Amino acid sequence: MNYLEFEKPLSEIEGKAEELRALARGNREMDVEKEASALDKKAETLLKDLYKDLTPWRKCQVARHPDRPHCKDYIEGLFTEYTPLAGDRNFADDHAIMGGLARFNDNPVVVIGQEKGHDTKTRIERNFGMARPEGYRKAIRLMEMAHRFRLPVITLVDTPGAYPGKGAEERGQAEAIARATQKCLEIGVPLVAVVIGEGGSGGAVALATANRIAMLEHSVYSVISPEGCASILWKDAEKMREAAEALRLTAQDLHKLGVIDRIIKEPLGGAQRGRRETVDAVGKAIEMMLKELVGRKPEWLVKDRRNKFLDMGSKGLAA
């Protein structure tokens, strides 16, 4: 288990409990269960206190936790007959974006998501979830296919932002993001999005311009990272805590503002402490959102999606 900075007191207690049990495994005559159980209860109480009222900055840390389920985990856990499709038919295949045909609850769908990777090798391969233009063009290709065959689209958003490298800019990063956002608004099929970790700027919006948007309880969704905002406004990246407060980037704030439609509850201690439980909860949320949309006419779906985004800013601003 990887512990976040604010979880250090918890790591000490859980570490002691594990040490006691390790000693008992090596010496069967030792009876440490009573003491270890007391430490477990103490750890659970502390965990509840730590997660009872997380600050926006701490939610950012939880959203970035390396042990959270990623796009690949959700695809493997919720979808069957997944057939990945590669490439943008123009330049290359971007591994930061996964996507393909699959079945959800035995119904055919198109699933698209950003994948960060789970270790050093896969994080480099996936570019830490930061898509290049060819990734967004791959997403456009998949959405066009979904529109053609009348298949619902499910997107899983988890990115610090689109890749800002020189090559990406030369190949039209801004245009690719804009085209992907435009395509989201055009397709006449149900489109639902779930922010499963970080929803960073236009890199997230390009996949999240949906009829229905859900966020995991401790995920974040923002126009810029707190560090980036602090660097611009205060010329000091260390002011990220103040920036996180000002950005209103939590699921709770965004639900009040009408930016998202649903908050998916996470297990105590975050998705990283209950991966299977979190995957199942996301699956139930997707099922409920699709039920609201499947069977609607293409014209209704396009109008609903456009109105949703045109109306943003008219709710919750006085809060």
Swiss-Prot record:
Known EC number: 2.1.3.15
Leading EC class: transferase
Pfam families membership: ACCA
Domain of life per record: Bacteria
GO biological process, one term: fatty acid biosynthetic process
Domain CoA carboxyltransferase C-terminal: 38-292
Subunit structure: Acetyl-CoA carboxylase is a heterohexamer composed of biotin carboxyl carrier protein (AccB), biotin carboxylase (AccC) and two subunits each of ACCase subunit alpha (AccA) and ACCase subunit beta (AccD).
Matches recorded under NCBIfam families: accA, AccA_sub, PRK05724.1
Biological function: Component of the acetyl coenzyme A carboxylase (ACC) complex. First, biotin carboxylase catalyzes the carboxylation of biotin on its carrier protein (BCCP) and then the CO(2) group is transferred by the carboxyltransferase to acetyl-CoA to form malonyl-CoA.
Family: Belongs to the AccA family.
Name listed for the protein in its UniProt record: Acetyl-coenzyme A carboxylase carboxyl transferase subunit alpha
Protein source organism: Cereibacter sphaeroides (strain ATCC 17023 / DSM 158 / JCM 6121 / CCUG 31486 / LMG 2827 / NBRC 12203 / NCIMB 8253 / ATH 2.4.1.) (Rhodobacter sphaeroides)
